[in-house]
Amino acid sequence: MRWLGLGAVLLVVGCGPTPAAEYGEELFGDSKLSESQYNTFSCATCHSTAATPPQGKVYAGLSLHNVASRPHWWGGYETNLLDAVNFCYTAFMRGVTPLTPDDPKSRALYEYLVSISPDAQAPAQPFTLVKDITDVPRGSAEWGADVYRAACQDCHGEAHTGKGRPSKLAPILPEVAADYGVAFPGVAPGLVFIEKVRHGRFFGVGGNMPLYAREALSDKDLGALLAYFEL
Ligand code: HEC
Ligand code: HEC
């Protein structure tokens, strides 16, 4: 528990859901937590809170069950929980000003995260970033269609049409790759696609899409997705 300046809040831990935790749960599912009018993501877009991985759904982020009981976050890059949250808030949710410890919204969110952390201590979760992009073997296109629905469709809408996507800022897949040959001459479009999925907006790639670590999406699932998209 390393949310600096929140000592007083710790006193309520273990007393069941508090009104603040309930407000925090609302904020967790609310894209309006971010002040940016272009943001359509809430914490719940990318994180489950379940103790066991949900079936039929692939989240970019880890489950936040027991998150407040972990010793560090982001594979050890973050040693303060608020910083770990602010990473998502600014990088993905287009938040301009990071959440501060004494902001009532941060406090409520923190209490909610504590309320979904029943164990006093929990192990840090592995987070394996794929830094060097290499091609992956293509898998089953049928499987790839399932991967698309489970991992990408919430934000990108239906494949080939984008139907149902919450924001047009997320391009239609795989059609967006049609320009890759011109934009990235000499690089196979499949590789550009893999880089986007593995790096999100990092390592020179722009945007606000989350990255997928190996734990979130295996190379096998990625290969199936590429087969489905004939990339
Ligand atoms: C667009 C997707 C996205 C959104 C929105 C998002 N996150 Fe994340 N978050 C990630 C990814 C990807 C990671 C890195 C993988 C991981 O550790 O879960 C991450 C990591 C984290 C971690 C570190 C977990 C650990 O143990 O390493 C915390 C804590 C966290 N997010 C909390 C939040 C909270 C709270 C919100 C809402 C304010 C939020 N995130 C919004 C994608 C997102
Ligand atoms: C949380 C929402 C979200 C999820 C989930 C998501 N994306 Fe995205 N994606 C976006 C947004 C927003 C953009 C446009 C901004 C950007 O490029 O980051 C984007 C852009 C892209 C691009 C285009 C990059 C370009 O400009 O050429 C590709 C390719 C892509 N996503 C693939 C995927 C795949 C494959 C998945 C599933 C494994 C996925 N995305 C899941 C939100 C998401």
Predicted regions mapped to residue ranges:
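N-terminal export/targeting leaders of redox proteins
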Residues: 1-32, 78, 83-86, 92-108, ...
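Electrostatic cytochrome c docking/interface patches
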Residues: 15-37, 117-147, 163-164
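Extracytoplasmic electron-transfer domains, predominantly the class I c-type cytochrome c fold
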Residues: 19, 54-98, 109, 170-231
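Periplasmic/extracellular electron-transfer cofactor-ligation site
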Residues: 29-63, 119, 145-183, 198-207, ...
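Short helix/loop segment immediately N-terminal to the Walker
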Residues: 35-41, 96, 126-128, 206-209, ...
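Inter-heme linker and motif-flanking segments adjacent to c-type heme-binding CXXCH motifs
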Residues: 52-53, 92-98, 116-125, 135-137, ...
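Amphipathic alpha-helical surface "interface" segments used
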Residues: 102-113, 128-143, 213-218
